[in-house]
Amino acid sequence: MVRLYFLKIGYAIINLCIKRFGVNYMGEIRSNPDELLRAIKNEDSYHKRGHLKIFFGYAAGVGKTYAMLKAAHAAKRRGIDVVVGYVEPHPRPRTAALLKGLEILPNKQIPYHNIVLKEFDLDAVIKRKPQLVIVDELAHTNAEGCRHEKRYQDVEELLKAGIDVYTTVNVQHIESLNDMVASITGITVRERIPDRVFDNADQVELVDIEPEDLIERLHAGQIYLDTQAQKALTNFFSIENLTA
């Protein structure tokens, strides 16, 4: 059973999540029951629309992407047509290893000054039309030249096209919880998703580890590179913030 540790950012946050969304016995936060009932009443539109599963955590490095990719392999074993649309590149060998055996679509290349940015290629996924696509970092802001400003808008278009989506997001990126997390950690996150995106998810899986284990991963270079890791340790990833 998944343990609900969210002591790291205060019991107030997890209690609010439970109150708003409900938690089943597997530790998965469910969508608002009224929202699901309304969708089920219109079976045609419900079955044509893609389903959204969010892997939900309290910080980078807790294992959201790892859990998402393991779930992708499980879906593939069940005969589901799965592709990887975008996975954030990080120095995490165990996570990178899980990309093996999955079809990976090329990123969209966007020239920006003297560099080339790599973004999720929405059109490539719609053209390929898999049953399930993996799209990391739901709160990401797209580069200029993409059809939508935010990645969650890309995901909404995929769902409307009847494609299921697995994605990841941290608690501080949810609009209504952002200020609460900022008051606990002292850090404001600019990239946010509207509550409705989270509310309308068909399934939300909590991914969590002890704060000491997370800091150990950070020290070991399993989350960020050295310079980023040191900065993170003195900001969001301080033990005071993670155990607040």
Regions found by a protein language model. Give the residues of each.
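A short alpha->loop->secondary-structure connector
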Residues: 148-152, 181-196, 222-226
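Pre-Walker A adenine-sensing motif
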Residues: 35-47
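Conserved ATPase-coupling elements of RecA-like P-loop NTPase cores
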Residues: 137-151, 177-179
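Conserved P-loop
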Residues: 51-120, 127
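Loop/turn-to-beta-strand initiation segments
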Residues: 81, 129-132, 161-166
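Conserved nucleotide-binding/hydrolysis micro-motifs of P-loop NTPases
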Residues: 88-93, 139-140, 165, 171-176, ...
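Short, positively charged and aromatic/hydrophobic N-terminal segments
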Residues: 8-24
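C-terminal accessory "lid"/substrate-recognition subdomains
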Residues: 196-199, 203-244
